[in-house]
Amino acid sequence: MGLVDSLLGKDARKFLKRKDSDAAEAGRALEELRSSLYNELKTSEGAKRQQQRFCGPVVAMSFNFVVAVGIILANKLVMGRVGFNFPIFLTLIHYTVAWILLAFFKSLSLLPMSPPSKTTPFSSLFSLGAVMAFASGLANTSLKHNSVGFYQMAKIAVTPTIVLAEFVLFKKTISSTKVMALAVVSLGVAIATVTDLEFNLFGALVAVAWIIPSAINKILWSNLQQQANWTALALMWKTTPFTVFFLLALMPWLDPPGVLLFKWDLTNSSAILISALLGFLLQWSGALALGATSATSHVVLGQFKTCVILLGGYVIFGSDPGFISICGAIAALGGMSVYTWLNLPGKSIDHMSNKQLPKQNVTVSKPKAEADDGGGETGVTVVSVDPLLSKTITANIV
């Protein structure tokens, strides 16, 4: 060491000591950050704060959009080239893999803490798990028995159903300008995508029956996260077992026989596993988006994806959906832009009208007794997978 010190010199030794000190400080800072995040995950309120901090509306919806496009390609491979024509069983595999991954996270203490059981009734979690299974299963069955156009019409009907359901359940209303923007979006998507309306009686009944579970599913995911301090992963952990149970019950009724005769070789199994991993990410990203925004905004995101796929195919791959379809997609994107602008902070009509009202200062003299008691003033300050690329794509509803 003496020889090394003599070769390095005094200045070099000081430099190395300073570097060691900086590295130690960086290590301590990283350890403190890790410890802080770990402690935050130990309470539902802390976990909720971390989710809101790292997964705001833009991040969550972008994450959901990218994963949704990826699973379209994966499921097209599985259902088309691989020939796995069992959409309910594929959805069951997706949720089973998600459950296994969540159990792995829990074993490593990486799963966020759930709120106290008394804050959320067991019936709410059970209902959400059941609704998820029916929304996924009925969506796949509708796509199997109806044309893409009729399936898309049922999908568009989810938007007004959500608005009506939120009014009935929570007395939640939206402004007339938002209603008009949503109407433009729905009409534009209908013009862009509904090219045929072929269906049979059974398929039509399934499509109509799917609308309500799909709407309620989105509303419950959004409401439980925003009102009851649930995080996406914690809620997935609690509800996925119920979803798996109901999918097992639906599979004999909605899937064709012969799943055990399928060729489960390495190539086919790998493709199905990749689809399942993307299905987990789709469920997680969809839950994050619903927790960060609202059920209506999540539906608009799905319609945005539809328009982007249609216009992207026209611009990039030279497909020709027709002039009317292109105009419909552009109109829908315009409606989405207006709806997004109206949801920005301070852009609502009510907020703007309140800002225009003159403020009046009113002085009220309080009785002496009330003043002596310290009385003060208080102020009160509120897997769907798009079917356009292929009719054989399964849907994972979140």
UniProtKB/Swiss-Prot annotation:
> Is Transmembrane helix one of the keywords UniProt gives this record?
yes
| Membrane topology field | Multi-pass membrane protein
Top-level taxon in the UniProt lineage = Eukaryota
Major location, coarse class?
Answer: membrane
What PANTHER family does this protein's entry cite?
SOLUTE CARRIER FAMILY 35 (PTHR11132)
Q: Which family does it belong to?
A: Belongs to the TPT transporter family. TPT (TC 2.A.7.9) subfamily.
Name of the molecule in the record: Nucleotide-sugar uncharacterized transporter 2
State the organism named in the record: Arabidopsis thaliana
